Structures are given as structure tokens and as C-alpha cells.
Amino acid sequence: MSNNSKIIQMCVAGQRKKGWSDEQFAHEFTVVHAEITKATAEKAPALLGYRQVLAIPRPRISAFNMNNSTWDSQAVLTWSSIEELSSLLKSEGYRANAGNHVFTEPDIVGSISQVAGEFVFDPVGYSSQESRFMVFVYIPRATRSSRELVTEQEVAQRLDNITKIGAGTGLLRYVINRDVTPSDPSQLFDGTPFTNGDWGVMGVTEQYWFKDEDTASAFFADEARVDALMKVPSSLDGKSCVAVAGQETVLVSK
């Protein structure tokens, strides 16, 4: 993927449609929706990447409020720009295909974000894994109505903290993303399944990659480590995190 300051990630956490079984939801998300999105990516050069995390069964992790989590899926779609994303969401082709495939409840958690910093603890271990276990975290702003971007200093503070916490552990890679959701997300998502999403309240999103679930569980089982993880910059609300964890599947990578 090219280094472009306009590249954004559309991140969405979803809950299965009411009454759906594990098997039905897993099929609709990891097979049907996956195939639709891959087909879209073939026709849309602006769709640069697509990653899925299926949180079924629930992982054995309690950090970041995951012990009470009701979230079944996490999708991360990488776009060349927010303008390109907006253009596709408004296209007839999208609305006739992906826009009609609804497999989650209307109330979703979402963020339009940009990578702000990262640290790879084990480059060889990360690159050699065909499949990894990922923990995706949404950290809301302390003031929900604020649209101020998290500062460079706060990003650096958080990155430095995680770099110290993750050293010598099973954590392979960490990425922090700054939320850049437009001030009026309804204009972007009007007429799409994302209209009722909880957009614009997040300050940052975070991604933690591990070799497997056992390694991730061991990492988050350390209470002192988790306490340190929950110490976030003052503009953020660490107590109200939303997190989704599961095996990551990379479906599109350009």
C-alpha cells in the first residue's frame, strides 16, 4: 500500500441480527459479505484493504470491557480517501449490492480514522504469520460532543506507553489510529446501513496483533499490565472502551 496522507480506515463493530445463530451470522459475515466486498474491491481501485475479525466464540479476554461484550464482528476497510469512500457509498452499484446486504443490527460502533503511529515488536513473527489474532479497541473522547482531534503529543504519549508495556511480551504489533470522522457523518452515510452508527464519539482506535488467542489471553491476564493499558491521555475515556477480538482474516490488500 502506498504512503498517502489521505488514506483512511472505515472501522465498524457490529452485532448479529436478532435471533441469528453463530453459524448463520458467521456465514453471512465471513462468506457472503466477504465475497461481496472482494468483488467490490476488484471494481474499485480506491478500496485498498479489507480485514475481518469474527468474535465467535467470545475470546477469553476481559480487558477493555470485553467480559461484557455483545459485539460479534469487526470490519476494517481501507480507502484511498474519504472522498472516494463517499463516492462509492452513493453509487447505484453499491446500494444494489453491499448496501442491501444487512447482517447486523442498526446500532453499530464506527470510526473513520487514520494511522497515527505504530510499533512492531516482532517483525519476523508478525510477517511470518498467515493468520493472526487481533484485538481492536475503540476509545471514546472524554467529552463525547467534542470534535477536536487527539493531539500529536497525546498519540506519542499513548504509543510510548504501549511500547513499554508490550516489550518482551507476545504482542507482535500495535497501531494507534486517530479518529477523523466528519462533523456531520449523516451526510456520508445517508441511505446506507451505517446511518444509525455511533460515529464521531471516538478519539482513537487501536489494533493489537498476537500469534493466537492463547498468547493474547496471557498478555491481558496480567492485571498490572491491564491497569497500565487503561491509563489513557486526559482527552480520552478509557473506562468506556469498546473492543472486539478474534482471528483476523485479510481479504483485500493492495
From Swiss-Prot:
Record's keyword annotation contains Isomerase: yes
Pathway it works in: Secondary metabolite biosynthesis; flavonoid biosynthesis
Keywords, in A-Z order: Flavonoid biosynthesis, Isomerase
EC number(s) stated in the UniProt entry for this protein: 5.5.1.6
Biological process (GO), any one: flavonoid biosynthetic process
InterPro entries from the UniProt entry: Dimeric_a/b-barrel (IPR011008)
Gene Ontology MF term list: isomerase activity
Broad class of enzyme this protein falls into: isomerase
Tree of life domain: Eukaryota
Function text: Chalcone isomerase; part of the gene cluster that mediates the biosynthesis of chlorflavonin, a fungal flavonoid with acetolactate synthase inhibitory activity. Within the pathway, cfoK acts as chalcone isomerase (CHI), the key enzyme responsible for the tricyclic formation of flavanone through Michael-type intramolecular cyclization of chalcone. The hydrogen at C2'-OH is extracted by the imidazole ring of His-33, which induces the oxa-Michael addition to form the intermediate enolate through 6-endo-trig mode cyclization.
Name assigned to this protein: Chalcone isomerase cfoK
Source organism: Aspergillus candidus
